[in-house]
């Protein structure tokens, strides 16, 4: 009889521990979602972001007017990236939607928060790029120089020698070169990479330098928001309005700060390459 009672007590203890662990995991995932837009509860972050001044209704896509004339008019643009392309801190609205509305473009937005250029798993840039429709028509392919590779200390690698056809996609440089080559061979359209606006990060600065070296090799476009001193010379008041944190813009940041600069570059680059 005592053995039966002991077994019941052990079963109850195990059940309580498992239940407590399950509650802890759920609460932790909710915290991750609310604070860092990560995991199955990532949508909870919108509760926080919707109250930011820079995400006010006046900055919504619905209130943006289409430009009278645009070199991008009617184009289909593919965007590949992570949280900044996704609009993680701006209620899932980024420069993608603003460019589309202002310039009458269609688009494919392949963006997943927290993902990397370096090919490690099904959500990496490369894996998701390879899942895109190979028969689609893209007029231009725009790719984000991911801050996640810098934050996660991914290997930078080095630019390959001329004539190289196989790339080390477990490094940032190799992944970038692979993406450029794959896009060119698959969709035969111009490739443009864009950087974040400036934030303090030696690894990301090194990635920007490497990207410019790759630009010289392949003739791709690079929208360099990182080292553009004039672009980054904004007031503290503007920065508070435009950025949810050091990396992620608000709707206002995309609409008033990033989008015009990106459009300016795309107009010129596409004019020379299409």
Q: In which residue ranges do the predicted regions lie?
A:
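N-terminal secretory targeting modules
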Residues: 1-80, 84-91, 101, 134-137, ...
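Short, surface-exposed, polar/charged, turn-prone segments marking secondary-structure boundaries
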Residues: 38-48, 105-108, 117, 135-138, ...
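Alpha-helical cap/lid subdomain in secreted, periplasmic
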Residues: 9-16, 125-274
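A generic structural signal for short, solvent-exposed coil/turn residues
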Residues: 69, 99-101, 183, 214
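Conserved SGNH/GDSL esterase-like catalytic core that processes O-acyl groups on lipids
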Residues: 76-78, 84-165
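Short, flexible loop segments at the rims of nucleotide/cofactor-binding pockets, characterized by
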Residues: 54-57, 117-121, 169
